[in-house]
Regions:
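Positively charged N-terminal leader segments that act as targeting/secretion signals
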Residues: 10-26
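N-terminal targeting leader peptides, primarily classical Sec-type signal peptides for secretion
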Residues: 28-32
Length: 267
């Protein structure tokens, strides 16, 4: 009887080791960029040479044209006496090592130009979408802006490994809504403290500190949100006091406008 129990324990122990090894292997496979579908190489673009890298998401071509990468926002390099955001130099160096002096393939967006006159385009190097590779390593956040969303599903999926592993920008994100104290890009998390309907959409206050503006065209996708829910949002924070002398009653100083459905998620 004792020997039978020992054999059973040995078999059970071996089975547990095999199961444990399986889950450990599956976990690391999940974190591997190779486990995620590669963004497709789309037709309709052109070849060009990159001669300068400004930062992690902007380059200059030999023609002189500046290009802003679609689908990603990387930390800002400090200018005019302001410090670099964490990870800014790392993202810039990564991009420079791969594309400076190289022939690349550029696929312009449906919206081809931003307000600074930069060409908006997907940038491929050796048939790989650069934004996808950067997101996989936590060098920036995925974005869906305007009509330039053809590869949004793929790019938002690409940031998952870095997020799970808390790599790069995900070491400090999401930020608590209560911590917002300056303009600029942010990925925040907070609890809904108030929802107010406006003429063109909804204002959603998080922790009585940060207001999100949700356009009416996106409101239907988030109709079930209610006070007390925890949500996550990403986008550019504005300081209302830079545009107006004082705040109206109940108005939050910090405002983040939701520009795409993917930028607002239940948490």
């Amino acid at each position: 009887m004792a020997s039978s129990l020992n054999r059973l324990r040995q078999r059970t122990s071996k089975k547990a080791l095999h199961v444990g090894a399986f889950f450990v292997s599956a976990f690391w496979l999940l974190l591997s960029p190779a486990a995620w579908a590669q963004c497709p190489l789309l037709p309709g673009g052109f070849d060009a040479e990159v001669v300068h890298v400004y930062d992690g998401d902007t380059v200059r071509l030999k023609s002189g044209q500046r290009v802003r990468l679609i689908g990603i926002d990387t930390p800002e390099i400090g200018r005019d006496g302001r410090p670099d955001q964490p990870g800014a130099r790392e993202a810039g160096r990564w991009l420079e090592r791969r594309v400076k002096g190289q022939q690349v393939y550029l696929l312009p967006g449906v919206e081809r130009q931003d307000r600074y006159g930069r060409l908006l385009a997907h940038l491929y190097w050796r048939d790989e979408l650069i934004a996808e590779k950067m997101l996989q390593q936590g060098l920036g956040f995925a974005l869906a802006v305007g009509a330039n969303t053809r590869l949004a599903d793929c790019l938002f999926s690409a940031e998952t490994p870095a997020r799970i592993a808390s790599e790069g920008v995900w070491r400090r994100a999401p930020r608590a809504a209560m911590e917002i104290d300056k303009p600029g890009f942010a990925l925040v998390r907070g609890r809904i403290s108030r929802i107010t309907q406006a003429r063109a959409g909804y204002y959603i206050d998080l922790d009585d500190h940060l207001a999100l503006f949700l356009p009416e065209k996106l409101g239907a996708d988030h109709a079930r949100m209610q006070v007390g829910d925890r949500i996550e949002a990403r986008g550019w924070v504005q300081d209302r006091l830079q545009r107006q002398n004082r705040l109206s009653h109940g108005q939050q100083r910090w405002l983040l406008r939701i520009t795409a459905d993917r930028h607002l998620q239940a948490n």
